Every structure is written in structure tokens, then in C-alpha cells.
Amino acid sequence: MNLIRHSALALAATTALLAGCATAPAPKEPVTLRVVAFNDLHGHLQTAALNLPHPNPASTAANPAPPLRVNVGGTAELAGLVKELRKGAPHSVVVSSGDAIGGTPLISAIFFHEATIDVMNRIGVDVAALGNHEFDAGAAELQRVLAGGCRPAQPGDTAMSCALGRHEGAKFPHLAANVLKADGTPLMAPAVVKTYGGIKVGFIGAVTRGTPTIVVPSGVAGLRFTDEAAAINAEAARLQAQGVQAIVATIHEGGFNDAAQMEWNSNACPGRRGEIFEIEKRLAPAVDVVLSAHTHQGYACVMDGTSKGRPVMQALSFGRGVSVLDLVLDPATGDVDRSKSVYRNLPVFNARTEAAHRELIIGQEPAPLATALRAAVPDADVAQRVAAYTEKAKPLADRVVGRIGGGFDTAANRGSSSAGRLIADAQHAATMAADRGGARFALMNPGGVRAPLPCRGTPPCEVTFGDVFTMQPFGNSLVVMTLTGAEIKQMLEDQQRAGRTNPSFLLPSKSLSYRWIAKAPYGQRVQDLRIDGQPVDPAAAIRFTVNSFMADGGDGLSLLRQGRERLGGELDIDALVSFLKTTPSPSADERVVIVND
């Protein structure tokens, strides 16, 4: 294991911060720096059935038409677009805004995410922020993956380290200004300084301070996550003291643009909401750009509505798009001239993209970006590397493990999704026997459902291990515990958290049902709570199942840490594989009835 090289990257970044870069003649003309950013790759290396919504030109107020679904994605295609965008810019930088690894399809997880780091090196990533999912396997494993070297084999491993030769680690620094070790020192370099045409530019990284509530506790043991804005502002002040005026913050936190969800290049963002916009309000004026992530949305908001406003960007997820920022650096001040800078989100076209969709979008872009979109082809080196990993994973990925009577999707419909209900039913089935815990119901967290389970062809459709793993990749175990009926009701009441507009509904098995009264005060929203059709006695001791992430208080479910008479069970993916042998079909049963009146 080589932890030295990645530490050296961090040390070099910090040294650059403190010492500044070698003095260079000040440029006489403005310097344009092209920033190409992507976020939340989540190990989606292959070209798959991914899409982005785009406004339908045939839609009118009188005759609205559904949005276009534009096929996009794939890291070979992403690398090809990056290459074309860099061709058109003498000065450029590629940034990843976190969650490149963790919560991934099998092709990344089966190689301990070394495949994703390998591909990012080949794409040419220059700077990355940490995301919450980088901590899924703990800080020590994160540092190993970034530094390089082979992971020692463990009993029962199905994953492979150094599958295509020695893992070289990341050839770019990972930044986290707000993640501190127990002794108060930073886990990673907080920032890095790079020079373009004689002008220094600082890049500061941060991750959502809510990471400890959405990552298994063992993954963040001994770490402290501080306020994002405060950490970035402190780092920006240090950068300015070193003569760095142009500052880019890459923050693994995000938001939404509710009023124009498909208008990912609208600068106005009238319906914007979410944590990143609250953070932006508290950032020092010295920060010129905010590259965001985490919510898998697309937006290009300019915050004060003027040409001098600060942009806040995000480019969806899974390599479906990139944010492109042409930052004009003023030679007199060394700062970003926001009035002359350009901010756009671009799709990553692939072979599945319809020609009409491609031409429609290209026609809406300024000439230099349109040229890059039209010229981009899949990068051969990345394509070959992904193919090699795919072939290595094929024996396990292609193994048929069950059948389904129809497709299960992740779209939330009145607080639930068919994919989430499937997983909850599988976990209940695995633990309802007395000798397996005697669970009366099961609950699944929506964030743990990572992908739909498609039915390809005529039902019953075969399901492979790769399909199941992509849907549920975290490797949690099942935990049966006891709470009283009153405690269970309180846990469900807590789905609506203070400061949040909408509740985050847990996904129940079919044995649990209730009504959610949206406009009722806290403590009165959950009504008619039933198990197997019978009202729940508040005083009764009730056994139920959750995954180990939830049982440890993940997703803010602190009450579950009080669960009594715990019994550990099998892995969540094993429970799902067993359930698929019954050929389940999607059900339309309403387990949670939402009343908005």
C-alpha cells in the first residue's frame, strides 16, 4: 500500500498555497480559463440507458407536450467531449465535484472503485472535491484508493483489487477544506493553486457537513465535518493573502431549480432552493464560482441576476453532462471578470442519442461549444479500458439470479417507488420467520435504492447479479430490532424534518400502511397506522427490519439507534436475490396514503 504519493499531492497543494507560485510576468491581455466540471459520477463507467430531460419544442401553453428524453452518458464519451473542449481552450482545467466513487454499479464496486479512479486519470481530471460517498468504506480505504496500491485480500471477497495490474491511485489532488481529523488537522489538502497565463487561480474543496448523517458511522469515525461556508471563507482569505484573487469553490452539496427543472442553462433560476444556495449566501465575495453536486440536478444559476453575479453550477450525475465555464481573468487585478465570463451546461452525447435531439441541442449552443459537441467522439483509450474492466467483471455480472414479472422503477409516486417497495418486501420476507427475527414489517431508505430494475423483453424477465448490485450496491446487512408502536409512529413523524419543505419518506413493506396528513402539525401527521391491516398499539413491542446503515442512525434516523433486542441478518443483496426467485411483479398498492387537503 502506498499512502505516500497521495499525501505528497496534498503536501504539494498546501505548499503551493503557502509559498505561492513562481513569479511570472503579468499578462497584458485577459486570460480565458475554461473550467470543465462534472459531479456525482458514482462509477457509471459504461454507456448505459441514461437520459436527461429537455424541453420539447413542440410544447405550447395550450398544448403541452412531455419533455424529450435525450440519451446521454458514458465515460468514453465524457472523455471525448472533454478532449474537444480542451482543444478549443489554451488554458483549461477539469474538476470533479465529488461522489465519483461509492454507490456505484458493479463495474466500479467489484474493483474496489480502482476502475473509476483509473478512468478519471485517463479523462484528465485535474482537481476533485470529496463527496459523502467517498467515505462509504472509511477514511483509511479512501486514502488507499487515492494513493494507489493493492488492497490485501480478505476472506469472502468477491471484489478484486489490482485486477488489470497495479493500481496507480489518483493523479490529481482531492480537496476538503471542512474535513478534520481528531487532532484538528485536515484529512486532505483544503485547496490547490494553479497558474494559467501568469495568473494564479485557487481551487477550494468542501463536502456537505451532513456527511456523518448519510454515511455509515464507521466510515466517518474520528472525523469532524465543519460548516462549508466558514471553511471556504477561511481558505479564501488565506489564498488572497498569498496574492490569489481568482477563486473557484467546488462543494459537494446541492440544490434544486423547481420552476425550471429542464432549463439547466437558465441563469435566473426563479425556483431555486436547497442547501447550496444557503451556503452561497454566506460565501465571501472573494469566491468567484461555485461548482456544486450531491442532488443530481442541472442548473446554471447566476445569483444576483446581473452579469456580475456569482454562478452556481451543477451538471446532473453519472457522467450525463458537464458544466463549462469560460472564466475571463483580468490581467490588472488577477481576478475573474464575471461580466465577460460564460457559463453553460452541456450534455454528453453517445451512440444512443437520437440525431434530431443532438441537432436540436447543438443549435442552441454558442459556436465554440457547438463545435465541440459536434466533433466529440468516444475516447478510444477510455473505451478500451472500460471494455477490459467489463470483461473482467462479466462472469459475476452476467449470472442470472432470478426473474421479475415487470420492471421496478425508482420514480417516487406519492412517497414511494416500486423499486423501494420491492426491496422492503424482500427484507421483510428474509426476516419474518421467528428464527430470523420475527419481523412484522421492513423499512428501506430511499437513498439506498440506486437504480431501477428493468424488465428486458417479455415477462418473466431474467435478472442478473449485475442488475441487482447496481440497484443495491452498499453491502449493508439486515438488522431486526424492537421499538414500541409509539416509537415507530414518532420515527415516521420524523420523516418531515425541520427546515425541509418536503418529507423524505421511508419505503415500507406491504404489511405496513398509514395515512400522511401533510398539513397537520408534527405529531399528528401519521394517522391510521396499521400492520397487516390491524391498528398499531402504541404500547406494543414490535419487531421490524432495517438495513445496518439505518440501524446505526444513518439518514438522520437517530431513534433507530435505540432499537432493542437486535438480531443481525444476511446481506441486503442476498435477501433481494432470494426474493427474486419468487418472480415478483410491481404492485400498485398504496402503503402510504398522502392527504394534502
Annotate each predicted stretch with a short phrase.
Residues 21-38, 62, 66-75, 83-89, ...:
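Non-catalytic terminal accessory segments
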Residues 22-350, 354, 422-429, 442, ...:
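Acidic, metal/ion-coordinating pockets
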Residues 10-11, 257:
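Intrinsically disordered, low-complexity segments enriched in polar/charged small residues
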Residues 1-10:
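Bacterial N-terminal signal peptides that target proteins for export
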